[in-house]
Amino acid sequence: MQFKVLAVAVLASLPLVAAAQSSVTVYGVMDAAIAKEDTGAPGGSRTVTNSGNQSSSRLGFKGSEDLGNGLKAIFNIEAGVALDTGATDSALFGRRAVVGLSGAFGNVTIGREYTPIADVAKETDVLGQGFYGSNLSAFTSGRLTRRISNSVNYKSNSLSGFRFGGAYATGETSTGPSLNLMGVMVDYTLGGLYLGAGYHTFERLATGDDKELIIGAGYKFGPFEVKGNYMEADPVGANNQFKQYNLGGAYTVDAHKFFANFQTNKLENGAKGNAFTLAYQYSLSKRTNVYTSYASLRNNANGVFGLNSAGTNVTPPATAPGSDPMALSLGIRHTF
């Protein structure tokens, strides 16, 4: 009888053991704001309700399964959400969709993933790739590549402060521009110091290679932090080279956080635009904050650069070079 009772107890516990070896987490960001935006061109002023002025609104699922001996299976799918309309991105899980393995060797994933350059850009933007005038504008304008589909990706664990990463993505075509991406990154962290660099090349079958580059740094000391980066895109063709410089700082005291960032954009054809951003965040709790931001951009006679936040784009039309965009927002962000 004792044996039967013990056997029943062991069998009853098996599902609990299996459940303990795997986990799934639901997470997200809900960010909405009222904004006054002006492209600087005639008729370009508007008042809007935006989703994602500080951080892109999203809903994600991530999980892992313990396979034993330090090896885990991992996955992550993440969808963009527009709180102003309730719509999702054109690709449901277009923000991230990967599956892979994690262990002492690092992480290997397959699917739609952030690029090596995007990892460094995120770490070296004091605005957190949110707010108008962040370095996100280099990606949302299509000049640099933030995410890549059909990719195989590797990221090492920290090795005495160093991390290494690489990605290869197939264009999935045998004729015409293939756009196979090969990318690498390396970064170093020591206390409050961060240094990083990344490089991409897009292999085209006929016309040559597009190239992208980032070098960035950051330092946090007490309530202060300073971050900056240099990004470059050199696509095939004449007068197409793009350069962006960012330098910003932030100061945190109690529930208050203040941001300032300066950005310069340049094209090889002589177009230039300088952007300046001021932002303020007040934390109501660990997961909820309200914020306000102001940004302005001054284009030269050839410039049509814009102010891009995580959720919107304030860019003059190509027919109105020299226009000066401006944006002001007031919003709330909740994370879970």
Q: What positions do the PLM features span?
A:
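Outer membrane beta-barrel
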Residues: 21-36, 46-171, 178-180, 187-191, ...
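Outer-membrane beta-barrel architecture
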Residues: 9, 60-62, 98-100, 153-155, ...
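Gram-negative bacterial Sec-dependent N-terminal signal peptides
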Residues: 1-21
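Transmembrane beta-barrel outer-membrane domains
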Residues: 50-54, 90-94, 143-147, 175-181, ...
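Outer-membrane beta-barrel "beta-signal"
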Residues: 322-336
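Detector for outer-membrane/organellar transmembrane beta-barrel domains
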Residues: 181-282, 295-296
